[in-house]
Amino acid sequence: IAPFMKSYKQPFLAQLRVKKRELPKNAVETWNVIGLIEGNDPLLKNEYIVLGAHYDHLGMGGGPSSKSDKIGIHHGADDNASGTSALLEIGEMLMAHKTELKRSVLLVAFGAEEQGLLGSKYFVDNPVVALSQIKLMINMDMVGRLNDAKQVYMGGAGTFPGGVELMKDLGPPLGLSPVVHAGSVGGSDHVSFYKKNISVLGIHTGGHSQYHTPEDKVELINFEGQKQVCQYIFNAIMKVGSTPYDMKFNPQGD
């Protein structure tokens, strides 16, 4: 996976919700991390699928925590080590099938999502390619807790033609039961792209009581389930990325 331009890093300043005595200006430099897998079609390689996941969490907790009175390491195993590990895994899978890709894929690990989608907002306000060239953004946020019913949840499938049908059809061959919300987008870094009239998919495996608490630990991750989710997302990218799939933006799934 090549760096985009000369570096993998896209630095930006994040305004953090911390005490002034800790950081006088309440701002730190952080990064989006960007890799490129270039497509092979002379024309379609200039169109991009963005696959993203945020890599930040809550540190020692405090105000943003669901247990704000309990200071302790917030491990963020599902939110969102699951998403960033999926990003790496799917990136490796895509590289193994690179010759089949017509469209290009940008792999982006976003910083400062927990502070208000700051990394993805910076990305779309300072795009590394023209926004008109980004045809689909797939976001993975909390994809490590697949339940016994094998339900994969997503918003945004209605933002491009055939999206609902595609994401439903890809599930059963893998033993998955996609829960596709056609008319809603959901909330995470993909929303920043949706607001710029870009088709999106926001994928997760459901909420749980450990969300934003110190109890979100690796012992609770369903590794076999996450493997299935990675294959599901990979199959979606290959479908959209290896065919001249119609990616016309449909606002709010209409």
Predicted regions and their residues:
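Stable alpha-helical elements in mature extracytoplasmic
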Residues: I1, V33, N80-A86, I90, ...
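His/Asp/Glu-rich mid-to-C-terminal helical/loop segments that flank catalytic regions of hydrolases
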Residues: E92, A96, S209-G253
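Acidic/histidine-enriched alpha-helical segments
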Residues: E100-V108, M137-M140, T243-G253
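Short, solvent-exposed loop/turn and secondary-structure capping segments
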Residues: K45-Y48, M60-S66, L117-K121, A149-Q151, ...
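Metal-dependent peptidase/peptidase-like ectodomains
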Residues: I1-P3, F110-H208, N222
